[in-house]
Amino acid sequence: MIVLRKWQADCLDKAKAHYQSHRDYFVQATPGSGKTRLAAELAKWLLEEQLIDFVICFAPTREVVAGMQRTFSAVLDQRFGNVIASAGAAYTYQSMEYQQEEFWDIFKKFRVLAIFDEIHHCAGHDPLLSNTWGQQIIRNIQDQATYTLGLSGTPWRSDDLPIALARYSDPEGQLICDYRYDLQSAVNEGVCRAPRITLIDNPLIRLVEEKENTESVRGFSCFSQLLSESPVSYEDLLRHDDILNAVLDIGILQLSETRHKTPQAGGLVVATDIEHAHQIAGILNAKHQSYVVVTSKTPRAQQLIDRFRHDNTCWIVAVSMISEGTDIQRLSVCCYLSRIRTELHYRQVLGRILRKMGPEDREAWLYVIAEPTLRKYSQRIANDLPEDQSTLQEKKLNDRLNQSHAEHANGNTVGAKESADNPISIKEQNGKGELQVTDASLLTLSFSQYYRQYLLSLM
């Protein structure tokens, strides 16, 4: 028998008391802390007390649904699949649109516990201001289910719409959680790994603009300055081989160190699109790293994810496949190279590497380009851990860097050219045409081989 974690037992007791007089219960718990196990234990208690007849679960993806089916089958010791069996079933939110009326009649004819994992995907309190999934909940479940359980690790939406079944304070409009288990508590109690978020920057960036018969050179001291004062975009950086090599080298080094202690540890690379994923895969291959690529176009992607979960492959490169709720405990290192810059998505990705494999498995590493928005999100996560101290690590910074700065200041670009191993034009590296300021302007971007690492970590 697996003993519940302290927070799970506490939340379970509070839920039992809450359901004596209320129908809806909302839990916010940090990703990787065991929300699904809590939900299964609560369902087991309600079934044993004969307060419900069935349990019906909804989740955002088939991968998460499969994980719920495994957990509920184990805890309930009964079949739990994608059809109503002895205990219940689990479905994707998308499937709600295609359910027949007979399915929704179950909520009217029987006592049902409806569980919504990552319920922030379902928006709205009324049909006019709801998304499709939220409308299904309002129409078919909200007033029909005997009990509801809403679960979320990141309980907000990028569009600021209210979450279905959630309650908000008035007039502040703050989400009211019946139980909250935050990242600080999860780390302090050893439930989750401590996140080590490393922002990767470059102190010596060279941008050459060729226009007609003239050439101008501009220098930048960080990515933030480059992005704000030049036509170069964040996605240009993500697709630049120099940047990819730098980020992946750091990730590979950390994964290698981790695998010395935990041989089955694996890494995740979050890519921008399918083309980008294969670009990253080519670099990993050149560095003799084992990997698998999973995208929406990958045949049998779910089987590949399941295989990676249990094998010894170093890296999984994913585009929107290793998402919230995906349980791959051996993931402990992540290179975030997605163009998506929302706090919701960023925290969800971080959650993929927080699950622990054992008591000695204490750290998770997230590597990200020091883009201003992602820097802000990283600092907010650090602020969730009051004991955190922001430290600066600079590797490979020496007198040569100072010399290169002086050469730039004096207009001498020879040293800068030597420090850029392989200057690549925007045209060559993104395949989408030249990056132009005017019709006759070509920009060539190159970087110093020296990268700064800003480490935000729990000390």
Q: What is each of the regions a protein language model found here?
A:
Residues 105-150, 154:
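SF2 helicase catalytic motif II
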Residues 65-107:
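Inter-Walker segment of RecA-like/P-loop motor cores
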Residues 33-46, 51-72, 272-275:
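Conserved Walker A/P-loop ATP-binding site and its immediately adjacent core
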Residues 61-64, 92-98, 271-275, 292-303, ...:
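Conserved helicase motor
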Residues 1-26:
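Conserved pre-motif I regulatory segment
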Residues 237-239, 243-246, 250, 254, ...:
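Long, largely alpha-helical accessory region at the distal end of helicase-like NTP-driven motors
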Residues 2, 160-261:
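Interdomain helical connector at the RecA1-RecA2 junction of SF1/SF2 helicase-like NTPases
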Residues 290-394:
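Conserved RecA-like P-loop NTPase helicase motor core
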